[in-house]
């Protein structure tokens, strides 16, 4: 894997919105009826970080339905720099699964220097919230993960999440945080995202 390639894996219960999060970031699309395949798939997105003088390729891996059977191959996790734990804020069980299964699964199958993100998705359904943000933040702190409240449907903090993944890849100890604020003052940007469309690539035939 290239020194400029950041492998990101998303895990969590089926229905939490992992595929929709990826689709929103990579192609700026939302389709809740999007079909999954029987094997993991990945998409690639390129981000340029002028501040760091780096261009990073994000390889974003989706379990694509295998999480239903909890039979994900170790190859899925191999070489991951970032692990994103996704739960549905309207589904308490999906959050409990993160704590009881997915975090341990990630921890056991990734390197010690892998960075973790905890993502509460479906912020657009806030009135149906079952998982309180304070509870999620407390858990994120306990596992040394950064916390994000997102909505793939309304495109809330999706770009922020993945841009931050690139920053953590460049400098795991960085305290820099992207907050959906791409400063263009004096012609400078914190990041520039390649606008090309990407189609998911399956890893099995």
Feature locations, PLM:
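Post-Walker A helix-loop "phosphate-sensing" segment adjacent to the P-loop in P-loop NTPases
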Residues: 27-35
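Conserved Switch II/interswitch segment of TRAFAC-class P-loop GTPases
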Residues: 80-100, 110-113, 123-130, 153
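Conserved catalytic network of the ASCE P-loop NTPase/AAA+ motor domain
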Residues: 50-53, 74-79, 107-112
């Amino acid at each position: 894997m290239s020194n400029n390639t950041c492998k990101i894996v998303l895990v969590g219960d089926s229905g939490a919105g992992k595929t929709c999060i990826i689709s929103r970031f990579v192609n700026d699309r939302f389709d809740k009826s999007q079909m999954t395949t029987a094997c993991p798939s990945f998409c690639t997105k390129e981000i340029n970080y002028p501040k760091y003088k780096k261009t990073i390729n994000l390889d974003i891996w989706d379990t694509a339905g295998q999480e239903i059977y909890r039979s994900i191959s170790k190859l899925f996790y191999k070489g991951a720099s970032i692990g994103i734990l996704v739960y549905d804020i309207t589904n308490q069980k999906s959050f409990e699964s993160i704590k009881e299964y997915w975090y341990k699964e990630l921890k056991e199958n990734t390197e010690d220097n892998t960075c973790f993100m905890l993502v509460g998705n479906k912020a657009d359904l806030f009135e149906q919230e079952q998982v309180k943000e304070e509870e999620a933040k407390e858990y994120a702190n306990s596992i040394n993960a950064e916390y994000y409240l997102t909505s793939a449907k309304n495109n809330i903090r999706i770009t922020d999440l993945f841009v931050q993944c690139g920053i953590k890849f460049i400098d795991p100890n960085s305290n820099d945080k992207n907050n959906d604020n791409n400063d263009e003052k004096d012609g400078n940007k914190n990041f520039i995202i390649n606008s090309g469309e990407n189609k998911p690539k399956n890893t099995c035939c």
